[in-house]
Regions:
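N-terminal lobe/hinge region of extracytoplasmic solute-binding protein
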Residues: 35-87, 118
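Surface-exposed binding/hinge segments that line
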Residues: 112-114, 121, 125-155
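Envelope-exposed proteins and targeting segments
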Residues: 28-30, 60, 79, 88-92, ...
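Short, conserved catalytic or interaction motifs in soluble domains
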Residues: 18
């Protein structure tokens, strides 16, 4: 019986100490291990509405600014490294971080954001978040079909 317990103890110690932890493997191989709960229904940021989908999008998408992870009230730089509010108190100028890149290495551009906001305002897309952009000049008019030229939207 002592031999059995000794062998079992050695087996347990060896099996627990060999190999790499998921964190070590992830760091070495650039893998993010994520416990998301349930499977996402999609990953299109303009369409999805569920919590599992947004957990993924928060991890892979960055806005012009980000919220302070320490709970502060100020916005922090995201893709935009800085921004200014013009005297009219309606127009923001964003200065993009030149190092901001997509996962394929392409540079993130202002046109990417313009395209994204214009797409979100396309009524046939069915985004449930379109009205969040209605504060932008002509956004609601474009969404309602009162104007047809997306370039008239103040993005």
């Amino acid at each position: 019986m002592k031999n059995f317990i000794s062998i079992l103890s050695i087996f347990i110690i060896v099996s627990c100490s060999s190999g790499k932890t998921p964190v070590e493997e992830g760091l070495e191989n650039q893998i993010l291990h994520w416990g998301n709960g349930s499977e996402p229904q999609g990953i299109d940021p303009h369409i999805v509405t569920g919590v599992p989908e947004h957990h993924i999008l928060i991890g892979v998408c960055e806005g012009l600014t980000i919220t302070d992870p320490k709970g502060g009230r100020d916005n922090l730089p995201g893709v935009a490294e800085s921004w200014t509010l013009k005297e009219d108190q309606k127009t923001y100028i964003f200065n993009f971080n030149p190092n901001a890149r997509w996962s394929n290495g392409d540079r993130v551009t202002p046109e990417d954001f313009v395209w994204s906001w214009q797409r979100a305002l396309t009524p046939t897309l069915g985004s449930q978040y379109s009205e969040m952009l209605f504060y932008v000049k002509n956004a609601k008019k474009f969404y309602d079909g009162e104007i047809n030229d997306c370039s008239e939207v103040g993005v």
